[in-house]
Swiss-Prot record:
Heterodimer of LeuC and LeuD. Disulfide bonds: none annotated. GO terms for biological process: L-leucine biosynthetic process. Pathway: Amino-acid biosynthesis; L-leucine biosynthesis; L-leucine from 3-methyl-2-oxobutanoate: step 2/4. GO terms for cellular component: 3-isopropylmalate dehydratase complex. SUPFAM superfamilies: LeuD/IlvD-like. Pfam families: Aconitase_C (PF00694). This is 3-isopropylmalate dehydratase small subunit. It comes from Brevibacillus brevis (strain 47 / JCM 6285 / NBRC 100599). It catalyses: (2R,3S)-3-isopropylmalate = (2S)-2-isopropylmalate. Gene3D superfamilies: Aconitase, domain 4.
Length: 194
């Protein structure tokens, strides 16, 4: 997993509430267990027609937002069924951070385990970010996990909270396996004594 320390990226404003995991990555694309290759199916039913043609009006199909790495969302992002494929699709597309007023718990936890930083900000703060992102194509935010702050180049600055353990894992690029491997010598010593 790649460390997340400071990230600057274009913000894609997805102005929909209750975006569920089936919208993030539809069920027909869940037939694989490897983590890569899902980005092409992200928001598939919103991005493409039934014939596979791009829907030009969808935010990620517009030129200003195709290279976005910060997703701005509304309340209850990631609700619905538990599927780790949802953060896999976001990450594979290129997103490193999702900002919203609230997240579904399982999705929120899965983001951390897969190298995506989910940030909870107030509805007022998210509204202000939507105003800026929608009025300024290529609007960028810098997310500083070390300092726990979201900034733009116009002076906006919003602090955010992250659990210290999750922060440590993201800063160091550690998933569950990476944490376990830190104790590989102790595990080997234990196994040798058995």
């Amino acid at each position: 997993m790649n460390p997340f320390v400071i990230h600057t990226g274009v913000v894609a404003p997805l102005d929909r509430v209750n975006v569920d995991t089936d919208a993030i990555i539809p069920k027909q694309f869940l037939k694989r267990i490897e983590r890569s290759g899902f980005g092409q199916f992200l928001f598939y039913e919103w991005r493409f027609t039934v014939d596979g043609a791009p829907i030009d009006s969808f935010i990620l199909n517009t030129p200003a937002y195709k290279e976005s790495t910060v997703l701005l969302a509304r309340n209850n992002f990631g609700c619905g069924s538990s599927r780790e494929h949802a953060p896999w699709a976001l990450l594979d597309y290129g997103f490193r951070c999702v900002i919203a007023p609230s997240f579904a718990d399982i999705f929120y936890n899965n983001c951390f385990k897969n190298g995506i930083l989910p940030i909870k900000l107030s509805e007022e703060q998210v509204d202000e970010l939507f105003n800026r992102a929608e009025s300024k194509p290529n609007y960028q935010l810098t997310i500083d996990l070390q300092e726990q702050v979201v900034r733009d180049n116009e002076g906006l600055s919003y602090p955010f909270e992250v659990d210290s353990y999750r922060r440590y894992c993201l800063l160091n690029g550690l998933d569950d396996i990476g944490i376990t491997l830190q104790y590989e010598d102790k595990i080997a010593a234990y196994e040798a004594r058995r």
